[in-house]
Amino acid sequence: MKQTSFFIPLLGTLLLYGCAGTSTEFECNATTSDTCMTMEQANEKAKKLERSSEAKPVAASLPRLAEGNFRTMPVQTVTATTPSGSRPAVTAHPEQKLLAPRPLFTAAREVKTVVPVSSVTPVTPPRPLRTGEQTAALWIAPYIDNQDVYHQPSSVFFVIKPSAWGKPRIN
C-alpha cells in the first residue's frame, strides 16, 4: 500500500512533465505558402484587404467551373432502329389456310348469379384539407473561386407556395 501511494504521484508527475512545453508560445509549422502570425496580425491583414477593395471585382464575374462530369441525370442513349428494307416480309401462301379459334374447354359450367347487397355507406364528418407546400430546386454547379477553393455541387430548395388549410372535403 505504501509503495503504491508513492508511485502514483511519481507517475502523475512524469506524465505531466511529458506534456509540458519548453516554450511559452505555440510553435509555428509554416509551409512554403503560409506564414506564421499572431491573431492580431491576422486581423490587421484582413482589415487591410477589406479596406483596399471597396467594390468587389469578383462579384461582377462568374467563377470558373471545375473540371469533370457532374451530371445528375444519366445520359439518354438513342437506340437505332433497323431500316424497313431489312425486315423480313410476311407473305401468305395461297395453299395455307388459317384455322378458326376453338375453345380449349367445352364442359358444361354452372352459372351462378350474384345479387348485390345494398349497403348504406356511413356518413363521416368533413375532414380538413391540408395542401402541401410547393418547392423548387436550384442546382449549383461545382466551381473554383478566386482563392483557388473548390466548392462542391449542391442544391438549394425554395418554397414557392407555402402549405395551407383548404376547405373541408366530404367523403
UniProtKB/Swiss-Prot annotation:
Its main location: membrane. InterPro entries: T4SS_TraV. GO terms for cellular component: cell outer membrane. Keywords: Cell outer membrane, Conjugation, Lipoprotein, Membrane, Palmitate, Plasmid, Signal. It holds the Pfam family TraV. The keyword Signal applies. It is found in: Cell outer membrane. It comes from the Bacteria. Residues 1-18 form the signal peptide. It is a lipid-anchor. A lipid is attached at C19 (S-diacylglycerol cysteine). The keyword Protease does not apply. A lipid is attached at C19 (N-palmitoyl cysteine). Involved in F pilus assembly. Appears to facilitate the polymerization of inner membrane-located pilin subunits into extracellular F pilus filaments. NCBIfam families: PRK13733.1 (NF010293), TraV (TIGR02747). This is Protein TraV. The gene is traV.
